[in-house]
Amino acid sequence: MGVAIDPGNVVVALRRQFETNWQMFAVRGVLALALVVVLVIRFYSGIRMLTPSFALYAFADAAALMIAAIWRAPPNGRAWLLVTDALVGFAAGAAVFARPLLPEFSLVIVIGVRVGIGGVLLLMSATRLDGHAGQRVMVAAGMVSVLFTAALFAAPHAGLSWRLAIYLLVFGCLNFALAWQLRSSRR
């Protein structure tokens, strides 16, 4: 016999976790924009620069997610969305780091899976916020991630670095907007 969970308490716990960890979204925005700068500056280095840069980004992003999941975690254990996203990030970073000379198509698959799963998890988190601060921005970030994944898989060989840079620019800005909304809602 399981324990009954009040959906209202789940929403409140998730909202509080995001509000107290608003810095995690700001860090994710900084990381995304830092990779955009690297991709734009080192554009002509191609896949040789993209592979280690993405691996470092995936590890750093996963670390930010894991810290947010553990730090000030809700007592009812509702951090599984953040933990899952972090584990997917660590796996993507490890896959790329272990094989730095991955063929471009393999890198497309790793990036697409990482971004797609992260987008779906953002959408799942957003549906649980039930009209609270940041829900619309979180939905937008999730949709951008899912649409980027679809575009990436639809045309895997079409300008990976530029498409990734554009996606990360939008995703980074949305994370800053989300951090700002969550921080403002704490007052």
Language-model segments: which ranges?
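Membrane-helix boundary elements
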Residues: 67-68, 72-73, 81-104
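Structural signature of hydrophobic alpha-helical transmembrane segments
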Residues: 45-60, 100-116, 164-168
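Hydrophobic alpha-helical transmembrane segments in multi-pass integral membrane proteins
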Residues: 92-101, 146-161
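N-terminal topogenic module of multi-pass integral membrane proteins
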Residues: 1-74, 183-187
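Small-residue-rich transmembrane alpha-helices that serve as helix-helix interface/gating elements
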Residues: 162-177
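Core segments of transmembrane alpha-helices
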Residues: 28-35, 85-93, 141-146
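Membrane-proximal helix-loop-helix units in multi-pass membrane proteins
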Residues: 92-138
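Cytoplasmic-side transmembrane-helix entry/capping segments in multi-pass membrane proteins
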Residues: 76-88, 110, 133-142
